[in-house]
């Protein structure tokens, strides 16, 4: 059913969920790989995972990546295509590929940031290898050769683009949670449409022990906010702000999120910030809104399952009704972690 979140100055209306990729029907799973990027008005690429339903109960990336193109803001999609780099890597047997984030440059170039994992451990997708980048200049018809975009092992958790510059944040740790001082969050930038990346900074959070997932968002004033997941305090999201596009940072008090947050994903739509991800203890799918990217509301549950699901991503699109946030996420269809890929639309209605 649809959900309405009421606030003094606005309401957020979230449509009913729709199945985007029916993995149950094809007896597969869809862990990770929810990247999307709009490379022309109303035209975007949407990635998803096609992975084993039995390895780690469906909660691994043992498989390959698919993608579809929509040219009408998500009303219809092309037939699925397998991402060649992911298929070749899988068949070679050295590592598997996920597309954690993708961005579209002003000239229409699609930049896909790819994670690599060995197939040697069954649990999820660790250890992480160094990330790779591939590009398409023809709307996903063909792809460049992959190259190592960051020399540190780890997981790129987020990438955003502003004024033609791509900003990417990686947690430099081949495993999930931080355990030592060298496990830090680094911010990289590309000023040539993803052909190369340079390090800008290390986000100076004083302690990254038991930290993992992270997210970034630019606010309306042009400040860049960074957030990190704290396993020890899932209702306190580490927060830092940069006033110079990621070169330097000010660490602030953690943001309080009443229902907890894992896998935080952020967006800005019609002047309202949106935060969504798994709730505390790996249960439920929760959505928060804020007017300043700091003070978040009490949170609203979008789903109440537990298990290896509710990994998500989002993209702001526009149709005849105005802007909407397309949220893509995984949801259980069987067992602990066999998941379909789902879509929901969130719209903001201003009351003023």
Where are these regions (language model features)?
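Asp-box/BNR beta-propeller blade signature and adjacent active/binding-site loops
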Residues: 1-352
